[in-house]
Amino acid sequence: MSRVGKMPVAIPAGVKVNVANGIFTVEGPKGKLSQDYHTEAVDFKIEGDHVLVTRKDDELQTRAYHGLYRSLLNNMVTGVSTGFTKTLVINGVGYRAEVQGKLLVMALGYSNDFSVIIPEGIEVKVDQLKVIISGASKEAVGQFASQVRKLRGPEPYKGKGIRYEDEIIKRKVGKSGVK
């Protein structure tokens, strides 16, 4: 039995889980998320305030799907109830970011500013040199944060660029010069 897959997913108050036609849908105060699944691999049983994910056989691929769909369901329930947040830190002279409507506009030391379209379901706030990305979908929040970070990743000598708040950049020593 999968260690991840056998654990039940708790459903908090105000969250509804629906499973029908190969799609499981989770609806809550922060939004509505849905995900299709392999009906030949797993079943979902809604029992009161929790959901159990069971697999139909013991094949290798089915066991992989078992843990995967349980994790996806758990992340969706967490997302629609509390949401997910990623914080990016901008470090560099003249580097700045601002939200203009549905665009995140950033000056990152190049001749032109970067304009990134904020996807549907994602909320972006800029607090001085921090960009706070939040939303119900863990995948969408992480994907957008990665896309923004990729514009100017942190460099190891001075630490300039965009990094995650909890990311530790391994610093390097510059050239020492011959005397």
From Swiss-Prot:
Disulfide bonds: none annotated. Signal peptide: none annotated. One of its GO terms (cellular component) is ribonucleoprotein complex. Keywords: Ribonucleoprotein, Ribosomal protein, RNA-binding, rRNA-binding. InterPro entries: Ribosomal_uL6-like, Ribosomal_uL6-like_a/b-dom_sf, Ribosomal_uL6_a/b-dom, Ribosomal_uL6_bac-type, Ribosomal_uL6_CS. One of its GO terms (biological process) is cytoplasmic translation. Gene3D superfamilies: Ribosomal protein L6, alpha-beta domain. GO terms for molecular function: rRNA binding; structural constituent of ribosome. Part of the 50S ribosomal subunit. HAMAP family: Ribosomal_uL6_B (MF_01365_B). Belongs to the universal ribosomal protein uL6 family. NCBIfam families: L6_bact (TIGR03654). This protein binds to the 23S rRNA, and is important in its secondary structure. It is located near the subunit interface in the base of the L7/L12 stalk, and near the tRNA binding site of the peptidyltransferase center. This is Large ribosomal subunit protein uL6. The lineage of its organism: Bacteria, Pseudomonadati, Spirochaetota, Spirochaetia, Spirochaetales. The gene is rplF.
